[in-house]
Amino acid sequence: MARIFKEAPVNTIWEGSGNVMCLDVLRAMQREPELIQVLLQDFARTAATHPILSSEFDGLQQLLQTTNSNDLQFMARALVSRLVILAQAVLLLRYAPSFVAEGFIQSRYSALHGQVVGMLKPKQVDVASILQRAFSA
């Protein structure tokens, strides 16, 4: 455990750490392909309950089935990013209030989504409930 904490600060500043992590995910997928199938099966149940996530899930699954390993390696960051965002959305749908889950989904998948705050349509997200929840703790 001490070694993990000792190396943690280095990981965030080490040049290329994001690429290394993404390539590690690809290696794990190649080494134990049944694990990604278990993960996708788990995502499928929840993703099917939301039209946006259902579409993203189908696209991600098609990408994994039709892309060769060299191309997957080239696009490792995009692939892992999609996996992570889908995992976050699935977990929020399962365990968070619906307005929180929907706010996250809209902020990541809507036509106006962006990497900064403020890229949503005003009526798409229950901002008042999200703020009330954040400040009531």
What do the predicted segments below correspond to?
Residues 1-137:
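Flavin-dependent oxidoreductase catalytic core characteristic
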